[in-house]
């Protein structure tokens, strides 16, 4: 290698080493402390659905063993409703995990550190289900135009708390903080519903109640119960017609299940249906009963001979066994006989009995 090339390589190596030493010297300097900048608090990851409008700060209100829940309506009747359906409901959700007594008291809020739930006749713009929540370090106040709005508000309160609040056992080492905020909310849609098919897969009364609880937590207000189809008839109909006991809708039509996990078939008595309706009403949810017809009617047709004009009183079957209920997943193979006057008499009787136990307008 020539002397010129050796010189150039040494010069390049020296420059590279100098640059490296300069870089390491700079990066090795002590890091200067920088004050962290707290981002504005947000509720977007906590609340479903997100309120129409809200402002939140970094401050907190903490529920403690001294916290009480005060409820006050515009009159005694409304106060009683708030006490049972809203105040005691909220307390029942908070007591197991906090271990606090959380007494529910009728009247004006006294002192600090409490939760107040009040109805105001000056908040008519909130409608039936709207609400406001004002939270400061000294307490939380729910204001609504109607008890339904106050009930929707406490679902927001539940979501504002740490997730452990939903546990049904005592949780230790958690500070039950709620971010200080102003929340103004009302539903965008009047009808916020869910559909539950209890025909193809029968759910017990307790199962339906749990489903209603889940709906309530997300401020839904309509439960559409699918009570009849080819695979089953799920509501008791009393009496007899044309010499046949309508209880056959239970003893035959309800003894089906398309479930693959061993769930038994079943039917709701009218008393059980009223129990479901009342449970939902306490959570400001309307039960909408639905009977599929004139199609999807195999469970009724195979149960009651008078609905069929055939010689043996059995439905036109096609490829299906018309001597027993159907437990498959096919659809579109059955229909009431629209030229049979007995069909309309049966439908009238079903609707008459359902109307007596269902307050729904549908």
Regions found by a protein language model. Name each.
Residues 18, 35-187:
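Acidic, contiguous N-terminal accessory segments
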Residues 22-39:
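Sec-dependent signal peptide cleavage junction
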Residues 124-344, 350-362:
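Feature activates predominantly on carbohydrate-active enzymes
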Residues 1-8:
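N-terminal secretory signal peptides that target proteins for export/translocation
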Residues 9-22:
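Sec-dependent N-terminal signal peptides
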């Amino acid at each position: 290698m020539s002397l010129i090339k050796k010189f150039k390589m040494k010069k390049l190596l020296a420059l590279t080493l100098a640059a490296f030493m300069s870089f390491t010297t700079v990066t090795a300097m002590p890091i200067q402390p920088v004050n962290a900048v707290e981002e504005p608090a947000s509720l977007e990851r906590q609340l479903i659905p997100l309120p129409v409008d809200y402002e939140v700060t970094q401050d907190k209100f903490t529920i403690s063993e001294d916290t009480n829940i005060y409820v006050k309506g515009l009159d005694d009747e409304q106060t009683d409703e708030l006490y049972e359906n809203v105040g005691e409901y909220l307390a029942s959700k908070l007591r197991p995990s906090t271990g606090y007594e959380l007494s529910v008291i009728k009247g004006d809020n006294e002192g600090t550190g409490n939760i107040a739930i009040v109805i105001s006749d000056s908040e008519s713009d909130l409608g039936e289900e709207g609400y406001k929540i004002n939270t400061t370090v000294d307490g939380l106040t729910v204001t609504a135009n109607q008890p339904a709005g106050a009930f929707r508000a406490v679902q927001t309160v539940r979501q504002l708390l740490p997730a452990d609040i939903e546990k049904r056992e005592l949780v230790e080492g958690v500070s039950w903080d709620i971010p200080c905020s102003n929340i103004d909310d009302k539903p965008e849609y009047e009808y916020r519903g869910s559909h539950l098919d209890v025909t193809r897969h029968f759910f017990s009364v307790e199962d339906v109640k749990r489903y209603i609880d889940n709906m309530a937590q997300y401020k839904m207000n309509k439960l559409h119960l699918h009570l009849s189809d080819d695979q089953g008839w799920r509501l008791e109909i009393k009496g007899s017609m044309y010499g046949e006991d309508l209880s056959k809708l239970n003893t035959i039509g309800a003894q089906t299940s398309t479930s693959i996990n061993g769930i038994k078939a079943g039917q709701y008595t009218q008393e059980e249906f009223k129990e479901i309706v009342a449970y939902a009403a306490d959570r400001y949810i309307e039960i909408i009963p639905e009977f599929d017809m004139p199609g999807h009617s195999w469970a009724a047709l195979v149960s009651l001979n008078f609905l069929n004009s055939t010689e043996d009183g059995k439905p036109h079957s096609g490829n299906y066994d018309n001597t027993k209920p159907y437990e498959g997943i096919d659809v579109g193979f059955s229909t009431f006989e629209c030229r049979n006057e007995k069909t309309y008499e049966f439908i009238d009787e079903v609707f008459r009995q359902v109307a007596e136990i269902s307050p729904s307008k549908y």
